[in-house]
């Protein structure tokens, strides 16, 4: 890639700045961390690796990066693409081979949703590998739009107010997941991916119900954004400004013992004595 234009330079700086802010705000990376960067071959994970490699050079702390791709043995997966790219970058990398594709095909009847099992198998394999190599953080490439979409998916289809946190300790307690692109917009990531000409591996969408639902939510948000620019950003800010007393979750707020404060001063004016 040659010299960047003014707009291209702004794009690169914006992504680096937003990722840096997210890392700092949530203390995602600390001195001496070994960050396992999970690569799928898509625009998001390539951009995340690029940004983290820059951050590694300029950050006031020292941390290591290890790139990891999981080859799930899906038919047609181009096994040579990522190793060639990572060798050219000159960074440490691992290709974890695990035939989860055959397991899913064997256990899930044709036409049924495979996402849940596929995701669990992939996550479990990556968690185990992170433990094996001594990784202290596991970086995923989810961005702001992914987080907002997940919020609506959970609300519409699961009846819960839940999204993707920028930083998460896994249920096993041994893995901490970070999402450095949490503040970054998908359109910026797409533009940067096009600019850098990353060797994209096409996503083999299975057409499952979960993917179809996510696409519906994505289109809904895009339509909102066209009609009211800035709405997605406002929704994302709302996820950082939660007020449990204004919701209805009894586990988050003690409504049962909520009573008047007898010591509180009256806020009403005695109009009779005016």
From Swiss-Prot:
Protein name, as recorded: tRNA-cytidine(32) 2-sulfurtransferase
Localization: Cytoplasm
InterPro entries: Rossmann-like_a/b/a_fold (IPR014729), TilS/TtcA_N (IPR011063), tRNA_Cyd_32_2_STrfase (IPR012089), tRNA_thiolation_TtcA_Ctu1 (IPR035107)
Taxonomy of the source species: Bacteria, Pseudomonadati, Pseudomonadota, Gammaproteobacteria, Pseudomonadales
Cofactor(s), by name: Mg(2+); [4Fe-4S] cluster
Pfam family, one: ATP_bind_3
Primary localization class, coarse: cytoplasm
Motif range (PP-loop motif): 40-45
Family the entry assigns: Belongs to the TtcA family.
Coiled coil: none
Cofactor note: Binds 1 [4Fe-4S] cluster per subunit. The cluster is chelated by three Cys residues, the fourth Fe has a free coordination site that may bind a sulfur atom transferred from the persulfide of IscS.
GO terms, molecular function: 4 iron, 4 sulfur cluster binding; ATP binding; magnesium ion binding; sulfurtransferase activity; tRNA binding
Record's keyword annotation contains Iron-sulfur: yes
Top-level taxon: Bacteria
Cross-referenced PANTHER family: AMINOTRAN_5 DOMAIN-CONTAINING PROTEIN (PTHR43686:SF1), SULFURTRANSFERASE-RELATED (PTHR43686)
GO cellular component annotations of the record: cytoplasm
Residues holding [4Fe-4S] cluster: 115, 118, 206
Function: Catalyzes the ATP-dependent 2-thiolation of cytidine in position 32 of tRNA, to form 2-thiocytidine (s(2)C32). The sulfur atoms are provided by the cysteine/cysteine desulfurase (IscS) system.
Catalysed conversion reaction: cytidine(32) in tRNA + S-sulfanyl-L-cysteinyl-[cysteine desulfurase] + AH2 + ATP = 2-thiocytidine(32) in tRNA + L-cysteinyl-[cysteine desulfurase] + A + AMP + diphosphate + H(+)
Principal EC category: transferase
Enzyme Commission number(s) of this protein: 2.8.1.-
GO process terms (BP): tRNA thio-modification
The organism of origin for this protein: Pseudomonas syringae pv. syringae (strain B728a)
Annotated pathway: tRNA modification
Subunit organization: Homodimer.
Miscellaneous comment: The thiolation reaction likely consists of two steps: a first activation step by ATP to form an adenylated intermediate of the target base of tRNA, and a second nucleophilic substitution step of the sulfur (S) atom supplied by the hydrosulfide attached to the Fe-S cluster.
TM helices/strands, residue ranges: none
């Amino acid at each position: 890639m040659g010299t960047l234009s003014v707009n291209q330079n702004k794009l690169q700086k914006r992504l680096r700045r937003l990722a840096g802010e997210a890392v700092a705000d949530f203390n995602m990376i600390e001195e001496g961390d070994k960050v396992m960067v999970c690569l799928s071959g898509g625009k998001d994970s390539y951009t995340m690796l690029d940004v983290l490699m820059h951050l590694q050079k300029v950050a006031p702390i020292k941390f290591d990066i290890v790139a990891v791709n999981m080859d799930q043995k899906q038919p047609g997966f181009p096994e040579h693409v990522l190793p060639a790219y990572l060798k050219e970058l000159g960074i440490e990398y691992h290709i974890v081979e695990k035939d989860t594709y055959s397991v899913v095909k064997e256990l899930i009847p044709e036409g049924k949703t495979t996402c849940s099992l596929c995701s669990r198998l992939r996550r479990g394999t990556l968690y185990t590998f992170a433990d094996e190599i001594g990784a202290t953080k596991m970086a995923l490439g989810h961005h702001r739009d992914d987080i907002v979409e997940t919020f609506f998916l959970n609300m519409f289809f699961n009846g819960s107010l839940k999204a993707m946190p920028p930083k998460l300790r896994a249920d096993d307690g041994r893995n901490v997941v970070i999402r450095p692109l949490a503040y970054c917009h998908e359109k910026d990531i797409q533009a940067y991916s096009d600019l850098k000409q990353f060797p994209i591996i096409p996503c083999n969408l299975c057409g499952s119900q979960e993917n179809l639902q996510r696409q519906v939510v994505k289109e809904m948000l895009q339509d909102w954004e066209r009609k009211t620019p800035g709405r997605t950003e406002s929704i994302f800010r709302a996820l950082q400004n939660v007020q449990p007393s204004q919701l209805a979750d009894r586990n988050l707020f003690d409504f049962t013992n909520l009573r008047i404060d007898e010591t509180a001063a009256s806020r009403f004016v005695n109009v009779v004595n005016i």
